[in-house]
Amino acid sequence: MAAPAKAQNPNPPPAATGPIYTLAFFETVAGSHGRTAKLLRGYSAATQGADGNVAILALHEIGRPARFAIIEVWRDKAAADAHAAALGSLRGALRPLLTAPFDIRANSGIDVAGDPVGTEIGAARAVYVVTHVDVFPPGKDQTVEMLKQLAEASRKEPGNLCFDVLQQDGRLNHLPLIEAWRDLAAQNDHATADHTRAFRNKLVTLQGALYDERLYQPIR
């Protein structure tokens, strides 16, 4: 009797090419904002001088003082990989303050325009938004097209400074958004705009997880 055929593994996603967007999220104990911000400023300054770095932005979540994020943009995967040890050192320095481990995700840009994130005119006072869009795999391609349409419309809003659509490496149905707005009022206008509401209404039937939208202010 012949042995049953083994199931074939699906083809792995292609290796990322072009710029790499590293997103890192972490949470700290209450009252540690000052120490955390100091470490992040030092890390940002050092990273700006690293070979292959395009942008680095440290963020503090609005209304959630214990939550932080880091956005790094690298020329390519090799440059991002070369800097991974430095990010590991930061994680080690922050370890006594952490209430949850670092969540680090590598992404590629699928609809990116304008100046690199964090270098926009008005960036020092901007409100940044990082959103994790997670859809069921069969709806990935439809969602990508919807996000491209949303990005095009959102960039035309008067208070928009940045609207980038990313795709997580290895999990192509995970589609982070990076936005920058002139202020909270501009971000609220976007949230209630017709094109945003239409997008959210379509997306809800495709979502594999809650729409995770977080608002931040930059750490300078």
Feature-to-residue mapping (PLM):
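An amphipathic, aromatic/His-enriched active-site/gating alpha helix that lines ligand/cofactor pockets
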Residues: 10-16, 42-57, 73-106, 153-161, ...
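Short, surface-exposed ligand-recognition loops at beta-strand->loop->(often short) alpha-helix junctions
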Residues: 27-38, 134-143
